[in-house]
Amino acid sequence: MKNSISLPESVQQILDRFQQHGYEAYVVGGCIRDVLLHQTPSDWDFCTSANPDEILQCFADCKTIAVGKAYGTICVNWKSVWYEITTFRTESEYADYRRPSQVTFTTSLYEDLKRRDFTINAMAYHPQIGILDPFDGKLDLEKRIIRCVGNPEDRFQEDALRILRALRFASAYACSLSQETNDAVFHHVNLLDSVAKERMCVEWTKLLCGSSCAVILQRYAAVVAHQFPTLQETIQNVPEWQAICERVAHVLPIPSIRWAAFCSVLGENAIGLLQQLRFSKQDQKNILRLVRLCQQPVLAEQSDLLRKMHQYGKEAVGDWLQMQLTSFSNQETVLQAIAQYKKIIADQICYTIKDMQICGNDLLAIGIPNGPAIGTCLNQLLEAVICGRVHNQRSELLQYAEAHYASSDTPNLMKY
């Protein structure tokens, strides 16, 4: 792996600003890891010998956020981009398995890197020096090993979320855990009970979207069972669990789709798992749509697809059909259904009430009473369009409504 990194101009300018003021500064952590893996970093983080007040002085001409100042972190807006800059520090006395009770600023980069979670995240870089890698993170990346910096027992007790982060990185980068890290995961799995559900949701989502999620979900089935008791019975059935893991790995790496594949065995009970992880109402809705669709057969009939699109939405049905390509035994039927779905989209075939060439006022005009009967009539007209009994044309729809609207003894139903 290379020892030099091409830095964005703005990142280099921040390093130069520190150097002009007489401080050490490096890009650090995940951005180094990503570059070595030939990936584009989502952000660039900095560490420096400057203390928080000195960081603020260096960037007095910039917008800054000092919410994390007590922990040594200042956010600096440079060229309209926010960057996180943290003073070299050591940590001690983790009281809640998350935050250090005591932070001590230091001028030692080595001490700062020593506090980090994994060797692959404990590297720093400066273009005049190269990659600083005191814990052989680059070698672990080459060997595809996730290894804690120092004693993994200590690292996991400092922040229990690191247990899931280890599995997430292994899933994302096709890695194995070092033996010591692996043993500590199983030994300290109970510590996950103390982690905020929202934080766990983020890590589980990234784990499920990793390229090696099937391997990790099977290898660490005990962790999954501890986190999600509703899956324990399924996990005990090894062939069934293996099939679910493979299904998750083969659908598109989109969070809602991966979660739906993961939860599909639970059916309606999936809502409990999603609520446990504090998913937003909208995310729960999107995932449950797919879970419910997964309980239904794939049919290549246009009317069946139109009904599903009306009930669950166009996007959900499209995602569901793609999921079936990896799990449905009759691939020919799935391919036919996908072709039919694409034709519906291309031809703009009606599948919702708002797509119909008629509205409630039109029904009022022909004598249908205001109230629930209007909605019922519109839904029945839509079903007639979906079934092909009437074309989606205003005159035909009005004629059909007049001919089929029930007598006054059943004012909310149409006669067929």
Q: Model regions: which residues?
A:
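Catalytic cores of the polymerase beta-like nucleotidyltransferase superfamily
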Residues: 1-416
